[in-house]
A protein has these predicted regions:
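Mg2+/Mn2+-dependent nuclease catalytic core
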Residues: 100-197
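C-terminal end-of-chain micro-motif
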Residues: 1, 197-198
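Metal-dependent nuclease catalytic cores that hydrolyze phosphodiester bonds in DNA/RNA
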Residues: 1-113
Length: 198
């Protein structure tokens, strides 16, 4: 990912990759991932920095390969891309968007931002999806994350998703896993965060 500036719903969203920092209308806002840390903050405690760094590098490579394939048809030797293509053929989903920037609002005030991995069309439904390359698929984490993105995407683009899916790719493992829609739980997580008073 690289630095970018987008205008969404009249708000200027800037992203600075080196710091992983989002700025909306000149004000720093946490990423959706940082909001998730309220509930899942110690998710990787006990995992060495080296392992985390290698996993991050691999995850970035997988995301980039899928983005390049979806946008330009660029092929790659990554097994995860082959598995993505298998899932796409098996489930007959169409990629409508990838790496879509969003702003999350509370009471019309920007409180967070992020980039959504995929918007899909599947069985004539619009689906928000996230690519996961973790050692184990954490459906609870993915559900909170995708519900926050669901709210933000609707606020930014006026489109409501009917399903949430995880495209899980880890080595030879592949899943197109559904996670539940629970916007109430997502809003409760925002309240639990405490940084966003009414």
């Amino acid at each position: 990912m690289s630095n970018y500036t987008e205008v969404i719903q009249g708000h200027t969203l800037e992203y600075f990759d080196d710091e992983h920092q989002y700025i909306v209308d000149g004000i720093c806002v946490p990423s959706i991932t940082q909001i998730l840390a309220v509930k899942f903050g110690h998710k990787y405690s006990g995992v060495s920095d080296k392992v985390l760094q290698n996993a991050a590098i691999r995850g970035t490579a997988v995301h980039k390969a899928i983005e390049d394939y979806c946008i330009n048809g660029t092929e790659s030797d990554l097994q995860e891309l082959r598995n993505f293509k298998f899932l796409q053929k098996q489930y007959e989903f169409e990629v409508l968007e990838n790496e879509t920037p969003v702003i999350l609002f509370k009471n019309n005030k920007p409180i967070s931002a992020g980039r959504l991995d995929l918007v899909l069309k599947y069985k004539n439904k619009i689906v928000g999806a996230d690519i996961k390359c973790t050692a184990k698929l954490d459906r609870e984490y993915a559900a909170y994350q995708l519900n926050l993105y669901k709210i933000a995407y609707r606020q930014c683009y006026g489109v409501d998703w009917q399903l949430l899916r995880v495209v899980y790719l880890k080595g030879d493992k592949r899943k197109f896993a559904q996670v539940p829609i629970n916007e109430t739980g997502a809003w409760e997580l925002i309240e639990e965060d405490g940084r966003f008073p009414d």
